[in-house]
């Protein structure tokens, strides 16, 4: 579910996640929640995963959400070379993991000349920007999915009678 191709959308406000190829029960303390398996699509992989470090899957999923939100806003992936960049496309593509590892990305469609957010171009998208900028950060500074769910842009957009409930049942 870590890439746009794994999301199925319909004519109503329904999104179905697919390709849930790897999952793991999150253990209770004192057992470590850290994972070591390299998985997922490179374009959506968090820096710690690409660098072979032990990682918390919840945090790398948060990173992948940031990549998805950015892609939906910008119609491009955040770590691809900027449109119009000169050079061999294969060499530019080969640099993508390096840009991910350095958290080197910028806005394009909503950017000013320096790649920073332009309030005029991004009017009405500030909440989405805050989510993306909170997710595409190094692991120690990245917001959790619970933090993102509590952000007004997300919280106020979800209207489910009775509210959303998290299921904590273990599936056999």
Locations of regions flagged by a protein language model:
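Hydrophobic anchor on a C-lobe helix of Hanks-type protein kinase catalytic domains
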Residues: 72-76
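C-terminal lobe of the eukaryotic/viral protein kinase catalytic domain
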Residues: 77-140
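Conserved end of the kinase activation segment
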Residues: 49-59
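Regulatory extensions appended to serine/threonine kinase catalytic cores
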Residues: 160-172
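Conserved activation segment of eukaryotic-like protein kinases, specifically the C-terminal portion
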Residues: 35-49
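Terminal C-lobe "cap" of eukaryotic-type protein kinase domains
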Residues: 137-161
């Amino acid at each position: 579910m870590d890439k746009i191709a794994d999301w199925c959308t319909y004519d109503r406000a329904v999104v179905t996640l697919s390709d849930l190829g790897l999952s793991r029960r999150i253990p209770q303390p004192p057992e470590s929640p850290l994972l070591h398996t390299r998985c997922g699509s490179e374009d959506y992989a968090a820096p710690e995963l690409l660098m072979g470090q032990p990682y918390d899957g919840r945090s790398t999923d948060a990173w992948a959400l940031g990549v998805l939100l950015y892609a939906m806003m910008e119609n491009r992936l955040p770590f691809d070379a900027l449109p119009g960049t000169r050079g061999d496309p294969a060499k530019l593509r080969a640099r993508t993991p390096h840009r991910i590892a350095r958290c080197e990305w910028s806005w394009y469609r909503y950017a000013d000349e320096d790649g920073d957010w332009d309030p005029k171009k991004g009017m009405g998208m500030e909440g989405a920007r805050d989510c993306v900028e909170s997710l595409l950060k190094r692991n120690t500074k990245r917001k959790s999915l619970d933090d993102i769910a509590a952000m007004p842009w997300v919280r106020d957009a979800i209207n489910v009678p009775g509210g959303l409930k998290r299921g904590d049942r273990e599936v056999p």
